[in-house]
Amino acid sequence: MKKFLLLSLMSLSSLPTFAANSTGTIGIVNLRRCLEESALGKKESAEFEKMKNQFSNSMGKMEEELSSIYSKLQDDDYMEGLSETAAAELRKKFEDLSAEYNTAQGQYYQILNQSNLKRMQKIMEEVKKASETVRIQEGLSVLLNEDIVLSIDSSADKTDAVIKVLDDSFQNN
Protein backbone atom coordinates (compact mmCIF):
# COMPACT_ATOMS: atom_id res chain seq x y z
CA MET A 1 0.00 0.00 0.00
CA LYS A 2 2.88 2.37 0.83
CA LYS A 3 4.47 1.64 -2.55
CA PHE A 4 1.21 2.43 -4.34
CA LEU A 5 0.79 5.64 -2.39
CA LEU A 6 4.40 6.65 -3.04
CA LEU A 7 4.09 5.86 -6.75
CA SER A 8 0.81 7.83 -7.00
CA LEU A 9 2.34 10.79 -5.19
CA MET A 10 5.38 10.76 -7.49
CA SER A 11 3.14 10.57 -10.56
CA LEU A 12 1.02 13.48 -9.41
CA SER A 13 4.01 15.61 -8.55
CA SER A 14 5.56 15.04 -11.97
CA LEU A 15 2.41 16.12 -13.87
CA PRO A 16 2.91 19.88 -13.43
CA THR A 17 6.54 19.53 -14.49
CA PHE A 18 5.55 17.58 -17.60
CA ALA A 19 2.80 20.05 -18.42
CA ALA A 20 5.16 23.00 -18.01
CA ASN A 21 7.72 21.37 -20.28
CA SER A 22 5.21 20.37 -22.95
CA THR A 23 3.68 23.84 -23.32
CA GLY A 24 7.10 25.25 -24.13
CA THR A 25 7.44 22.82 -27.02
CA ILE A 26 4.34 23.91 -28.88
CA GLY A 27 4.32 26.64 -31.48
CA ILE A 28 1.74 28.07 -33.82
CA VAL A 29 1.86 29.42 -37.36
CA ASN A 30 -0.63 31.77 -39.00
CA LEU A 31 -0.99 30.30 -42.49
CA ARG A 32 -2.85 33.31 -43.86
CA ARG A 33 0.06 35.57 -42.93
CA CYS A 34 2.51 33.14 -44.52
CA LEU A 35 0.49 33.27 -47.75
CA GLU A 36 0.12 37.05 -47.73
CA GLU A 37 3.48 38.20 -46.37
CA SER A 38 6.07 35.77 -47.71
CA ALA A 39 7.88 36.57 -50.95
CA LEU A 40 6.67 33.29 -52.46
CA GLY A 41 3.06 34.02 -51.48
CA LYS A 42 3.27 37.54 -52.92
CA LYS A 43 4.80 36.24 -56.18
CA GLU A 44 2.18 33.51 -56.56
CA SER A 45 -0.64 35.96 -55.79
CA ALA A 46 0.69 38.46 -58.33
CA GLU A 47 0.87 35.75 -61.02
CA PHE A 48 -2.66 34.63 -60.18
CA GLU A 49 -3.97 38.21 -60.38
CA LYS A 50 -2.20 38.67 -63.71
CA MET A 51 -3.91 35.55 -65.06
CA LYS A 52 -7.29 36.76 -63.77
CA ASN A 53 -6.78 40.13 -65.46
CA GLN A 54 -5.84 38.51 -68.78
CA PHE A 55 -8.98 36.39 -68.69
CA SER A 56 -11.09 39.37 -67.67
CA ASN A 57 -9.74 41.41 -70.58
CA SER A 58 -10.49 38.70 -73.13
CA MET A 59 -13.94 38.12 -71.64
CA GLY A 60 -14.54 41.88 -71.64
CA LYS A 61 -14.02 42.05 -75.39
CA MET A 62 -16.57 39.29 -75.92
CA GLU A 63 -19.00 41.04 -73.56
CA GLU A 64 -18.67 44.27 -75.54
CA GLU A 65 -19.38 42.48 -78.80
CA LEU A 66 -22.36 40.66 -77.27
CA SER A 67 -23.68 43.92 -75.87
CA SER A 68 -23.33 45.62 -79.24
CA ILE A 69 -25.20 42.85 -81.05
CA TYR A 70 -27.86 42.75 -78.34
CA SER A 71 -28.40 46.50 -78.67
CA LYS A 72 -28.88 46.09 -82.41
CA LEU A 73 -31.33 43.23 -81.87
CA GLN A 74 -33.34 45.40 -79.45
CA ASP A 75 -33.38 48.39 -81.82
CA ASP A 76 -36.62 47.99 -83.82
CA ASP A 77 -35.65 50.64 -86.38
CA TYR A 78 -32.32 48.94 -87.03
CA MET A 79 -33.91 45.49 -87.32
CA GLU A 80 -36.64 46.76 -89.70
CA GLY A 81 -33.94 48.13 -92.00
CA LEU A 82 -32.33 44.70 -92.34
CA SER A 83 -33.37 42.00 -94.74
CA GLU A 84 -34.76 38.78 -93.28
CA THR A 85 -31.48 37.01 -94.03
CA ALA A 86 -29.37 39.71 -92.40
CA ALA A 87 -31.61 39.73 -89.32
CA ALA A 88 -31.41 35.93 -89.09
CA GLU A 89 -27.63 36.10 -89.45
CA LEU A 90 -27.44 38.69 -86.67
CA ARG A 91 -29.56 36.51 -84.36
CA LYS A 92 -27.43 33.48 -85.23
CA LYS A 93 -24.26 35.45 -84.57
CA PHE A 94 -25.63 36.51 -81.17
CA GLU A 95 -26.55 32.91 -80.27
CA ASP A 96 -23.16 31.57 -81.38
CA LEU A 97 -21.27 34.30 -79.56
CA SER A 98 -23.38 33.74 -76.42
CA ALA A 99 -22.59 30.02 -76.49
CA GLU A 100 -18.90 30.76 -77.06
CA TYR A 101 -18.94 33.26 -74.20
CA ASN A 102 -20.59 30.78 -71.82
CA THR A 103 -18.11 28.05 -72.78
CA ALA A 104 -15.15 30.40 -72.38
CA GLN A 105 -16.45 31.60 -69.02
CA GLY A 106 -16.81 28.01 -67.77
CA GLN A 107 -13.28 27.21 -68.93
CA TYR A 108 -12.04 30.43 -67.38
CA TYR A 109 -13.42 29.51 -63.96
CA GLN A 110 -12.14 25.96 -64.24
CA ILE A 111 -8.63 27.11 -65.17
CA LEU A 112 -8.62 29.71 -62.39
CA ASN A 113 -9.76 27.16 -59.80
CA GLN A 114 -7.13 24.64 -60.91
CA SER A 115 -4.45 27.31 -60.93
CA ASN A 116 -5.43 28.52 -57.48
CA LEU A 117 -5.42 24.96 -56.14
CA LYS A 118 -1.93 24.32 -57.55
CA ARG A 119 -0.74 27.65 -56.19
CA MET A 120 -2.05 26.87 -52.71
CA GLN A 121 -0.55 23.36 -52.78
CA LYS A 122 2.83 24.75 -53.81
CA ILE A 123 2.80 27.38 -51.07
CA MET A 124 1.57 24.89 -48.45
CA GLU A 125 4.42 22.49 -49.32
CA GLU A 126 6.90 25.29 -48.79
CA VAL A 127 5.22 26.38 -45.55
CA LYS A 128 5.44 22.79 -44.28
CA LYS A 129 9.16 22.65 -45.11
CA ALA A 130 9.78 26.02 -43.48
CA SER A 131 7.74 25.00 -40.43
CA GLU A 132 9.78 21.84 -40.05
CA THR A 133 12.99 23.89 -40.21
CA VAL A 134 11.70 26.31 -37.55
CA ARG A 135 10.43 23.45 -35.38
CA ILE A 136 13.86 21.82 -35.40
CA GLN A 137 15.77 25.10 -34.92
CA GLU A 138 13.63 26.11 -31.96
CA GLY A 139 13.47 22.64 -30.42
CA LEU A 140 9.70 22.42 -30.62
CA SER A 141 7.71 19.20 -30.49
CA VAL A 142 5.00 20.51 -32.74
CA LEU A 143 3.96 23.53 -34.80
CA LEU A 144 0.21 23.89 -35.22
CA ASN A 145 -1.96 25.93 -37.52
CA GLU A 146 -3.14 28.93 -35.52
CA ASP A 147 -6.72 28.30 -36.66
CA ILE A 148 -7.01 25.10 -34.60
CA VAL A 149 -5.70 26.62 -31.36
CA LEU A 150 -8.22 28.28 -29.07
CA SER A 151 -5.76 29.95 -26.74
CA ILE A 152 -1.98 30.07 -26.44
CA ASP A 153 0.67 32.50 -25.27
CA SER A 154 1.78 34.93 -27.98
CA SER A 155 5.39 33.81 -27.54
CA ALA A 156 4.38 30.52 -29.18
CA ASP A 157 3.67 32.31 -32.48
CA LYS A 158 6.44 31.30 -34.89
CA THR A 159 4.88 32.84 -38.00
CA ASP A 160 7.62 35.46 -38.43
CA ALA A 161 10.32 32.78 -38.24
CA VAL A 162 8.49 30.63 -40.81
CA ILE A 163 8.08 33.62 -43.15
CA LYS A 164 11.80 34.37 -42.81
CA VAL A 165 12.70 30.77 -43.74
CA LEU A 166 10.25 30.96 -46.67
CA ASP A 167 11.80 34.20 -47.89
CA ASP A 168 15.35 32.85 -47.54
CA SER A 169 14.37 29.72 -49.46
CA PHE A 170 12.64 31.80 -52.15
CA GLN A 171 15.69 34.04 -52.62
CA ASN A 172 18.00 31.03 -52.91
CA ASN A 173 15.88 29.46 -55.65
Curated annotation (Swiss-Prot):
Q: Which residues form a coiled coil?
A: none
User: Pfam families this protein is in?
Assistant: OmpH (PF03938)
Q: Which UniProt keywords apply?
A: Signal
- Per the UniProt entry, what is one GO biological process? protein stabilization
Q: Which residues form the signal peptide?
A: 1-19
* One term of GO molecular function: unfolded protein binding
> Which top-rank group of organisms is this from?
Bacteria
Q: Which InterPro entries match?
A: Chaperone_Skp, Skp_dom_sf
Concerning its family, UniProt says: Belongs to the Skp family.
The record's annotation in PANTHER family points to: CHAPERONE PROTEIN SKP
Protein name as it appears in the record: Skp-like protein
